[in-house]
């Protein structure tokens, strides 16, 4: 996808980009490729592929009407090079975005990126999702949590649901639809007082299938969740 195609597709969906936003995406691409030489951020470095499979793919929650352009608090778990939250932040500057990542080198990249792109209302923290979720400054503080290809729902739900306010939503972006994954996660979702509200399917412009599972938090999460770092993965609920 050429940058011009990206701009035109957004304009067609009533999301025209300003020159500043176009420059932000361009600089994002340049820094991604530059830093990818030093640390492993992505296997995708071809410009047209980045615009399609990182930038366009990341803004799917906006294109699907799941996220409003308001000052809402969004947490991105395991964002890696900032996907999906930072492309959404460029598109919707009002979003208040927090990223937690377990690799400090990636956090360094994100801090520089935010500075270069002149993004305000972005916060980056180095550490494990399980640890921050027990901190009252993070627990039950967010309207949305996003996760793009991070873990199976059975594990992901324990890592993310505790961060949500009651009524808040987890948006899990995936490249494959696995109904059995949601069946597996049924017990975990019950224990975490949350429920699958929707399982959206759509296609990228190149016809690659994509899915967003929407999970709503119904009640406060029991204090014992999430368990200690590593446990959700080792012994899923």
From Swiss-Prot:
Entry EC no(s): 2.1.1.-
Locations listed in the record: Cytoplasm
Cellular component terms (Gene Ontology): cytosol
InterPro entries referenced in this protein's UniProt entry, alphabetically: rRNA_ssu_MeTfrase_G, SAM-dependent_MTases_sf
Region (Disordered): 218-237
Enzyme class: transferase
Record carries keyword Ribonucleoprotein: no
Entry keywords, A to Z: Cytoplasm, Methyltransferase, rRNA processing, S-adenosyl-L-methionine, Transferase
Annotated binding of S-adenosyl-L-methionine, by residue: 78, 83, 129-130, 148
GO molecular function: rRNA (guanine-N7-)-methyltransferase activity
Predominant place of localization: cytoplasm
Gene3D superfamilies associated with the record: Vaccinia Virus protein VP39
Record bears the keyword Nucleotide-binding: no
Similarity comment: family membership: Belongs to the methyltransferase superfamily. RNA methyltransferase RsmG family.
Function: Specifically methylates the N7 position of a guanine in 16S rRNA.
Name of the protein in its database record: Ribosomal RNA small subunit methyltransferase G
Organism: Streptococcus pneumoniae serotype 2 (strain D39 / NCTC 7466)
Lineage summary: Bacteria, Bacillati, Bacillota, Bacilli, Lactobacillales
Gene for this chain: rsmG
């Amino acid at each position: 996808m050429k940058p011009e195609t990206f701009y035109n597709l957004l304009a067609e969906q009533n999301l025209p980009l300003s020159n500043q936003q176009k420059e932000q995406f361009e600089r994002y691409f340049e820094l991604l490729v530059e830093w990818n030489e030093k640390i492993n951020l992505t296997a995708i470095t071809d410009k047209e592929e980045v615009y399609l499979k990182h930038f366009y793919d990341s803004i799917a929650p906006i294109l699907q009407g799941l996220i409003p352009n308001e000052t809402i608090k969004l947490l991105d778990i395991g964002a890696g090079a900032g996907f999906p939250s930072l492309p959404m932040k460029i598109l919707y500057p009002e979003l208040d975005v927090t990223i937690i990542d377990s690799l400090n080198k990636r956090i360094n990249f994100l801090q520089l990126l935010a500075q270069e792109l002149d993004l305000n209302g972005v916060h980056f923290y180095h550490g494990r999702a399980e640890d921050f979720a027990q901190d009252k400054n993070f627990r039950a503080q967010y309207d949305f949590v996003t996760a793009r290809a991070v873990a199976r729902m059975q594990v992901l739900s324990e890592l993310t649901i505790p961060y949500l306010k009651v009524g808040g939503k987890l948006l899990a972006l995936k490249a494959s639809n696995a109904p059995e994954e949601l069946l597996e996660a049924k017990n975990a979702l019950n224990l975490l007082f949350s429920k699958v509200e929707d399982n959206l399917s759509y296609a990228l412009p190149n016809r690659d299938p994509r899915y967003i599972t929407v999970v709503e938090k119904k009640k406060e999460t029991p204090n014992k969740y999430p368990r200690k770092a590593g446990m959700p993965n080792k012994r899923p609920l």
